[in-house]
Regions:
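Non-catalytic, conserved peripheral segments adjacent to functional cores
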Residues: 1-107, 126-128, 135-196
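Short beta-strand His + acidic residue motifs that chelate non-heme Fe in jelly-roll/DSBH
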Residues: 112, 120-125, 133
Length: 196
């Protein structure tokens, strides 16, 4: 029996990874990454950088991508809960513009592997969340781009958000930085030829 269950999402290139957790009176243990299991599942990746962020409830980050240096990402929540989203922006892909969203939490211990060629973002659902991710290429700030989090063409069903009003269902305001508020819609990026 493998040490993790690797589940292909409906969009090619996206995978949910569920670990096999060994738990007893001392606590628990599980593998968060096993190259042999990943390669056996057809996921041959090489990570160059690990990142960690902490966010309060209502923080929405994204939707980010790098044009010339696309990054694959293996993401998980170390504390709290997040709704994590990947949008297919691969030129010629039959699922271009479609998204997959997954809830990641410290409790479910799921991970989400996002192949290069996707825009990525997440919303913090708990009072606080610590988010960790491994990437396959280095961060290149001059190459960073993004798509509007509420682009109607993509139609992400963000949980616990009251429409596009900028608040969560419990009244918590969305916290989105100025840069992420200014990202264009996918259609505008297509017109400008960014995905050719």
């Amino acid at each position: 029996m493998g040490k993790m269950n690797i589940i292909a999402c409906p969009i090619d290139g996206l995978y949910v990874i569920e670990p096999h957790v060994f738990q007893d009176e001392r606590g628990y243990f599980y593998e968060t990454y096993n190259e042999r299991d990943m390669i056996a599942a057809g996921l041959d990746m090489h990570f160059v950088q690990d990142n960690e962020s902490m966010s309060a409830k209502g923080v929405l980050r994204g939707l980010h991508f790098q044009l010339r240096h696309p990054q694959g990402k293996l993401v998980r929540a170390l504390q709290g809960r997040v709704y994590d989203v990947a949008v297919d922006i691969r030129p010629g892909s039959p699922t271009f513009g479609r998204y997959c969203g997954v809830e990641l939490s410290a409790e479910n211990k799921r991970q989400f592997y996002i192949s290069p060629g996707f825009a990525h973002g997440y919303l913090t659902l708990s009072k606080r969340a610590v988010f960790a991710y491994k990437v396959t290429d280095f961060y290149h700030p001059e190459d960073e781009a993004g798509i509007a989090w509420n682009d109607p063409q993509i139609g992400i069903a963000w949980p616990e958000i009251a429409g596009n009003e900028g608040i969560m269902a419990d009244g918590t305001p969305l916290l989105i930085n100025a840069r992420d508020r200014k990202w264009p819609r996918l259609q505008q990026l297509q017109r400008e030829g960014d995905f050719e």
